[in-house]
């Protein structure tokens, strides 16, 4: 089985369409979506409709989905994020707002191997920023492979009986991680719509349960078009500028 794994789309239609096209070229059987479909970007309705059409086998909410649909207040968001999420709420159709509001909270068990969450298995809004965060998340996970998002950074953590390892993606080739028993893994496929690791290309992952391997990819997309849409909709200019920086 090959699972396409996408996270943190953030209403970036140009990035999303490019990722799906590349994933179809690579081949996949099922889809897992790790949350934050909306926020920051200019096309929340189109993204909701496209993701709904995917008929994902695993789909959970992110913090921007909660606030953008009115489930929670934007308390804790910075000024730019608050501006964008209020615009998102105002511009979402009632159908898409209700659909987002009904998305389930993570973590979610997918199968005997895979669990998904937005932030961590113990708190959907918590971040994995360092080794201690990663260790705590892996100990809380109920499956050998836990897929997470929220940080917008591609990374893979491995915990074996005698050591803890970290694998980071670079800009030259996809990062593949062999899934060996009885190790535990915590993998972030990166952000589709707003990468924050210095690489502006859209990120995604594919888990092959037969080959017991997870691979995380990057793909170039028409950033200028996404930037133009943000400016066109009157969202903060910084949200357009950061797409070219990958920050």
Place the predicted regions along the sequence by residue:
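Conserved beta-strand scaffold positions in the cores of enzyme catalytic domains, especially
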Residues: 5, 59, 146, 186-188, ...
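His/acidic metal-ligating clusters that form di-metal
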Residues: 26-27, 91-159, 247
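Structural motif
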Residues: 30, 58, 114-115, 145, ...
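Acidic, His/Gly-rich catalytic cores of divalent-metal-dependent hydrolytic chemistry
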Residues: 161-247
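Active-site environment of divalent metal-dependent phosphoester hydrolases
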Residues: 10-15, 39-41, 64-69, 108-109, ...
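Short, well-ordered secondary-structure micro-motifs
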Residues: 70-72, 127, 157-160, 227-229
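Active-site-proximal beta-strand elements of phosphoester/diester hydrolases
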Residues: 2-10, 113-120, 186-190
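Core catalytic region of metal-dependent phosphoesterases/phosphodiesterases
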Residues: 2-99
């Amino acid at each position: 089985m090959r699972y396409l794994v996408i996270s943190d789309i953030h209403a970036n239609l140009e990035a999303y369409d490019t990722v799906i096209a590349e994933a179809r070229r690579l081949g996949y059987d099922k889809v897992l979506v790790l949350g934050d479909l909306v926020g920051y970007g200019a096309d929340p309705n189109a993204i909701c409709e496209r993701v709904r059409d995917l008929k994902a086998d695993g789909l959970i909410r992110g913090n921007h989905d909660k606030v953008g649909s009115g489930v929670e207040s934007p308390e804790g968001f910075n000024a730019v994020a608050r501006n964008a999420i209020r615009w998102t709420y105002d511009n979402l159709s009632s159908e898409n707002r209700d659909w987002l509001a009904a998305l389930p909270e993570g973590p979610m068990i997918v199968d005997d191997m895979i669990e998904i969450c937005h932030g961590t298995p113990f708190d959907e809004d918590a971040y994995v920023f360092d080794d201690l965060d990663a260790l705590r998340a892996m100990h809380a996970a109920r499956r050998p492979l836990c897929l997470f998002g929220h940080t917008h950074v591609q990374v893979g953590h491995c915990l074996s009986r005698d050591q803890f390892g970290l694998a980071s993606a670079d800009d030259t080739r996809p990062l593949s991680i062999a899934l060996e028993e009885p190790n535990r893994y915590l993998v972030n496929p990166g952000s589709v719509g707003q990468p924050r690791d210095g690489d502006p290309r859209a990120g995604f992952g594919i888990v092959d349960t037969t080959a017991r391997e997870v691979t995380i990819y990057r793909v170039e997309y028409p950033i200028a078009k996404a930037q133009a849409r943000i400016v066109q909709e009157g969202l903060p200019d910084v949200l357009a500028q950061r797409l070219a920086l990958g920050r």
